[in-house]
From Swiss-Prot:
Transmembrane segments: none annotated. PANTHER family: FLAGELLAR MOTOR SWITCH PROTEIN FLIN (PTHR43484:SF1), PTHR43484. GO terms for cellular component: bacterial-type flagellum basal body; plasma membrane. It is found in: Cell inner membrane; Bacterial flagellum basal body. The keyword Cell inner membrane applies. It is a peripheral membrane protein. It comes from the Bacteria. FliM is one of 2 proteins (FliG, FliN) that might form a switch complex that is proposed to be located at the base of the basal body. This complex interacts with the CheY and CheZ chemotaxis proteins, in addition to contacting components of the motor that determine the direction of flagellar rotation (Potential). Residues 1-27 are annotated as: Disordered. This is Flagellar motor switch protein FliN. Keywords: Bacterial flagellum, Cell inner membrane, Cell membrane, Chemotaxis, Flagellar rotation, Membrane. GO terms for molecular function: cytoskeletal motor activity. GO terms for biological process: bacterial-type flagellum-dependent cell motility; chemotaxis.
């Protein structure tokens, strides 16, 4: 019985191949900061959504210069800020040097 126990314990020891795999895993560990720095130059599309409106094709065809499309938001409502189509924040429209900008007011937590 004692011999069987020794055999089982010896079987549990890592083989040389398993030791190499463990060493490679250690080499591959990269800090989150290094990972972010590595990918920080990747371009992403930032989209600001002021509002939406549903119209029929007939209503769209009847529109022309000067037509007004009413959207689903009040002037005081925050706008949606999306990155690559995903809602990440809400903000307020502001004017900066004669151009429109968005001031972030809320960060949207990821929904799971």
């Amino acid at each position: 019985m004692e011999e069987q126990t020794k055999e089982i314990q010896e079987e549990k020891k890592e083989t040389p191949q398993e030791e190499v795999r463990e060493e490679k895993k250690e080499e591959k560990k990269v800090s989150v900061i290094e990972l972010i720095q590595h990918f920080s130059d990747i371009p992403v599309e930032v989209e600001v959504v002021v509002g939406r409106a549903n119209k029929t094709l007939g209503e769209l065809l009847a529109m022309g210069i000067g037509s007004v499309i009413e959207i689903d938001r009040e002037p005081k409502d925050l706008v949606d800020i999306k990155v690559n189509g995903k809602l990440i924040a809400k903000g307020e429209l502001v004017i900066i040097d004669g151009k429109i900008g968005v001031k972030i007011k809320e960060v949207v937590k990821e929904q799971r």
